[in-house]
């Protein structure tokens, strides 16, 4: 490969969803997709947003943002081997990585939740997350507790 004429990277255009025109909604949408069924993912997300609007009488986009903000972790723990022992070392994470984890935890908690369909389960989980309840919030608190307990190993980066 020639080093003189290296190709310049083009900035990827951020994709937005057609209704809310929001990147965060698109991030959630892409993680709902299973087996390439994007139209089903759109239907699930938009119906969940409509249910949030009906239940809370607030802007569903604000509820989604607040839920993700509440669930976003600041620290995670990673396993590191040092002299034959494995330590759980706490790491600070970048905001984008935190959002991705928060979305993943919210969707996982929604899927495990009892309910008639995914739309209602997702809407209830998002509403609970804004109130500071739910399995996704519990997961974040669990991760933060583990990071706090292993703070002594923070030097083993």
UniProtKB/Swiss-Prot annotation:
Key word Plastid present: yes
CDD domains for this protein: uS7_Chloroplast
Record's subunit section: Part of the 30S ribosomal subunit.
GO terms for biological process, alphabetical: translation
Database matches in InterPro entries: Ribosomal_uS7, Ribosomal_uS7_bac/org-type, Ribosomal_uS7_CS, Ribosomal_uS7_dom, Ribosomal_uS7_dom_sf
Compartments, as annotated in UniProt: Plastid, Chloroplast
Chief location: plastid
Alphabetical list of Pfam families matching this protein: Ribosomal_S7
Protein name: Small ribosomal subunit protein uS7cz/uS7cy
Protein's UniProt keywords contain Plastid: yes
Function: One of the primary rRNA binding proteins, it binds directly to 16S rRNA where it nucleates assembly of the head domain of the 30S subunit.
GO terms assigned for molecular function: rRNA binding; structural constituent of ribosome
Keyword vocabulary terms for this entry: Chloroplast, Plastid, Ribonucleoprotein, Ribosomal protein, RNA-binding, rRNA-binding
Record's GO cellular component terms: chloroplast; small ribosomal subunit
PANTHER family xref list: RIBOSOMAL PROTEIN S7
Family (UniProt): Belongs to the universal ribosomal protein uS7 family.
